[in-house]
């Protein structure tokens, strides 16, 4: 039987709070550090490795974290989620984004519909539509091919799909799968839509309107903006627009769209990149086969999240360490630092996914909690961040845990050798040096140049950003956030009660 208890009532959490603190500066110095780097590794899907050698953990802390995972029933709660339990009690909804990429457990039937079959059906419909666009079977009114796709949406309808598109754009060009350029309109500020429309040939553009409810203010406002632009160009908007929405929304059967593809209430916006929300734009931009590879990578990582052993479950361990840092060590924020320009918008997507999920102060029963919950998430790609906010990370008064992401190879296979090393080698050397510097510090008699060290970090290391690896990376963070929601608030971590309160 699953029980839902506040974090501070769990005996294992009380024990965790009493475990001795790890001096990461000492632990990462010399032979100790080399040993930790080899031992504190967990394999992930698609060739990734999660390395937590520079985190403030040791055997005692890890044992306490394992006890916390067991008492909090993290494995059982995840199993209940993917088997169709009502996890989102605030809105009385199932939580099924993992089901968009694979079947982890039992068949999930909701509203009389097998939901896995429903999601696959939408993916197949999108693939058929995208292939017809690419082949020229579906064209503009003049019989000419569409060359650009523009997604209109906000929040999870923008941040995730935009981040995924940017992550794969160069890979697709290098691997000859690039079909159409994608643009995104999100902000209700008219300059956003105006600038995008000025940058495209509207006669050869297809627009995707994304709104689950069909009533999202910003999205419908921008749709009107786009329709005016099409009308002013002498074009029939209904021949240039498709919708991604729910089957019950006013958009579902409208004649204003070439086609409508469906999502449902069981997919939270910030977890919708593997649903039709991401599927339509990514399939049009890169082809359905690329989107399928992306789903396969996410599904492979989801399977690892089922493991009850925290040393074989990178998402659960990452989540547990994050809770330890937030609730025992008292760190207020976390920086996500991908050393890949392809992931330039990935931190912004994770910022929404994490903070909108775990930025809550009441538990699933509506009761206030007496402890801190989700941290502030921020980040930028390296090495840009090194010349921006790393000053505070190294020498500021707050200790900020760091999540590095690094890759052995770039996407375009173009590089230059300067002083006996390539740019990619310099990039990798930078991230390695930063991990050591944050952990061990650098002594200097000039106090303005002195780095105390003792700043914890972890790194996810992969070979290259490609569709499958991107899917695995996305699933890692989605499932980490989920496990933390289970721990912090017995959480209604999928609900989104305050997004429109100021409107």
Question: Where in this protein do the model-derived segments appear?
Answer:
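Glycine-rich oxoanion-binding loops at beta->alpha junctions
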Residues: 118-139, 164-165, 169-203
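A short, charged/proline- and glycine-enriched loop
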Residues: 143-147, 178, 330-332
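Short glycine-enriched loops at secondary-structure junctions
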Residues: 154-158, 188, 245-249
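Extended, charge-enriched "interface" segments that sit outside catalytic cores
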Residues: 4-142, 486
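Carboxylate/His-rich catalytic cores and anion/metal-binding grooves
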Residues: 147-157, 162-165
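Short, hydrophobic/aliphatic alpha-helical segments
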Residues: 137-149, 260-262
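A SIS-like phosphosugar-recognition module
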Residues: 192, 197, 203-495, 499
